[in-house]
Amino acid sequence: FHDKMKVLVTEPGFEHAVRYVLRDINYELFCQELLTIDNKKDFQLLVMRSFLEGLTQKTTKGLTGNNLDVLDKAKSYTFMSNHRDIVLDASLLNLLLIRNGIKTSEIAIGNNLLIYDWISDLVRLNKSFIVKRDVGVRQMLDAARQLSGYIHFAITKKNESVWIAQREGRSKDSDDRTQESLIKMLGISGEGDLINNLKEINIVPVSISYEYDPCDYLKAHEFLLKRDNPDFKKSQRDDLHSMEIGLLGFK
């Protein structure tokens, strides 16, 4: 953990993001404080919370959440969410959980988003686990079993909650129907039938909504390109641009 942290604080991309959100910060002192942290829980509570509170103050008129009071703080859940923003959907849920005294969730993130080493380090420090998105057809079932097994393990053995998007990729047209293959993947693991396997991981539907979507024009452009060319694939630069605009734009 500490070795990853030492590398992270030297990365220009990380420094740029921190300085943008926390304009008056003494970055050198901030880095010294980071290097005193030695576990993921403290990293989320002491660092990510401050970052996200600053971000919401700067780029929103406020963040609210409903029905968090129905969650049992002693239990772990699979938060299955609609998908609007690459970075913020899970991060803002975790901020709301922290505000309400509920433990944060681990975050499922596609390996296609690990564009730079410092991003890979940051997401792992922030309780993320990697979903393999670039496997061939023959490896897809093995990857699904591995992912399903880990989620069941996290919920039932580690007592950690998990966030996962209800579909692969952000919805570009507000169609939030859950991807059928995701439900099948979650039901692969466990000792019972499909229904009991799904019950085991305590699925909680989550709906997230942004008043304004700073990436709306990017999504519209991508939707148009895919309509005209079904084989169109985004580049890593496209994903990175969407991550930056989503984080820093007003929403």
Model regions and ranges:
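Conserved nucleotide-cofactor-binding alpha/beta core module
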Residues: 106-137, 141
